[in-house]
Curated annotation (Swiss-Prot):
Family: Belongs to the dethiobiotin synthetase family.
Name of protein: ATP-dependent dethiobiotin synthetase BioD
GO CC annotations, alphabetized: cytosol
Taxonomy, superkingdom: Bacteria
Organism the protein comes from: Clostridium perfringens (strain 13 / Type A)
EC number of the protein: 6.3.3.3
Residues that coordinate or bind Mg(2+): 17, 55, 116
NCBIfam families: bioD (TIGR00347)
Residues binding substrate: 42
Keyword Cytoplasm: yes
Catalytic site: 38
Upper lineage: Bacteria, Bacillati, Bacillota, Clostridia, Eubacteriales
Amino acid sequence: MEKGVYIIGTNTDIGKTFISGLILKKLREEGRNAGYYKAVLSGAIKEKNGLIPLDCEEVMKISGLKESYENMVSYILENPYSPHLASEVEEVSISMEKIKKDYKSVRDKYDFILCEGSGGIVCPISFSEKKLMLEDIIKEFNLQIILVSNSGLGTINYTVLTVSYLRNLGLKVKGIILNKFNKSDIIHRDNKKIIKELTGVNNISTVPKIEDIEKYDLNELNEVLYGI
């Protein structure tokens, strides 16, 4: 396995970017030379000087990483669609060769790479010209996966199905993070227990709803990051 992890979610807007920033912050504060990479980012904000990839902005703000956009993302798209549709509408041809080349550049600069996916695992990156799925990129990079999921009602189904699908693809699930976890909520506590039993994934961390990142104990991520 490469020295890095791939962060994916059970769905879009599940908190992958925020969690990516937290993990990167923890690694860098521990003295790790850790960087960030995202193959395709859609939903960027158009400003006078070009497109601003908000995911990169958020990760850098949380983690303290200072890096240029072009060294973090291979393709920055404006429309907030699935990557395959955004690239088609914007007439951008997505190349696996460019993604591989850009990733190698990041890998050569950093000792540990945190890669963030686009949405869930069943995510078409390119479809009209040559079919490219998110799973193809993860396999190419040979990275373990940290799955980010919601903590509330319904997450057992989403999480167990995603873990099962990942394993059917031959991908390794390093751990699971339950986001916006409330320890006083009986549903949240039970969800964690049942997910662990049904998936067999022992490394499960929980992240509460965080108002002030500086007051958050990053050691709460230790379980999911064990061995990294």
